[in-house]
Amino acid sequence: MSTYAIIKTGGKQVKVEVGQAIYVEKIDAEAGAEVTFNEVVLVGGDKTVVGTPIVEGATVVGTVEKQGKQKKVVTFKYKPKKGSHRKQGHRQPYTKIVIDAINA
């Protein structure tokens, strides 16, 4: 059974394994930089360790592959018979990270 972990980042919990690429909310780091996640909620594998609320001493290390923006989401507000309408677009920034190691 391969080792996996559940980490908290960007207000969400993400299940990660070594070698996996994940997309998370934007992290201020350049492409190629190393990122360490200290908020590890669970480490699983042969022996599962559940944190209360986090696992002490456990870290997940990853490398930033790229920074980007998601596809555009368009919102449109319209009031009939008033000639009022409003169109707005938004692109959420993200960071793509490749997981290098899970240290428990």
Curated annotation (Swiss-Prot):
Pfam families: Ribosomal_L21p. Keywords: Ribonucleoprotein, Ribosomal protein, RNA-binding, rRNA-binding. GO terms for cellular component: cytoplasm; ribonucleoprotein complex; ribosome. It comes from the Bacteria. GO terms for biological process: translation. One of its GO terms (molecular function) is structural constituent of ribosome. Belongs to the bacterial ribosomal protein bL21 family. Part of the 50S ribosomal subunit. Contacts protein L20. This protein binds to 23S rRNA in the presence of protein L20. This is Large ribosomal subunit protein bL21. It comes from Streptococcus uberis (strain ATCC BAA-854 / 0140J).
